[in-house]
């Protein structure tokens, strides 16, 4: 069933915006992940001397307790917005996408938008322990190192492919 509404008629600006939205949102998420890596790796060696780990660890915990609640809502909102855009791209004017891989790619993108959930519980355990007032600073830094390993794997296995699929789906969707 196609949602052939006048506002999304073939060639309309609304349809073009819909087709481009996965590219925009996956790029935002990828840049967020890169910024996250550079921000968090600053607290770890070689950028931080092991001699300063207790001082830096305490500052890191305070920073994390402040930044996570501020950033979390925005990231979740963008992920949800991306999913809605991908679902709409699957069902709005699907006949326009015949002869291209766009619909398939929007579906792959939707799958990848959920793929990070496989590591989310482990990452949330790290985050809770890092932010806990009972966690001593040097342990928080050890937890951060472990979290970074899991996050780096997620970045290369999920986030980069998610972005590539977003780019590819957009290109396919616009040329269809």
Swiss-Prot record:
Keyword annotations for this protein, in alphabetical order, are: Membrane, Transmembrane, Transmembrane helix
Q: Where in the cell is it found?
A: Membrane
Regarding the membrane, this protein is recorded as: Multi-pass membrane protein
**Protein name according to UniProt:** Oxaleimides biosynthesis cluster protein N
**Which pathway is this protein assigned to?**
Secondary metabolite biosynthesis
The induction field says:
Expression is positively regulated by the oxaleimides biosynthesis cluster-specific transcription factor poxB.
| Gene field | poxN
Protein purpose: Part of the gene cluster that mediates the biosynthesis of oxaleimides, cytotoxic compounds containing an unusual disubstituted succinimide moiety. The first step of the pathway is provided by the HR-PKS poxF that serves in a new mode of collaborative biosynthesis with the PKS-NRPS poxE, by providing the olefin containing amino acid substrate via the synthesis of an ACP-bound dec-4-enoate.
- GO CC field: membrane
| Taxonomic superkingdom | Eukaryota
Q: Show which residues constitute the signal peptide.
A: none
Q: Where are the transmembrane segments?
A: 5-25, 71-91, 104-124, 155-175
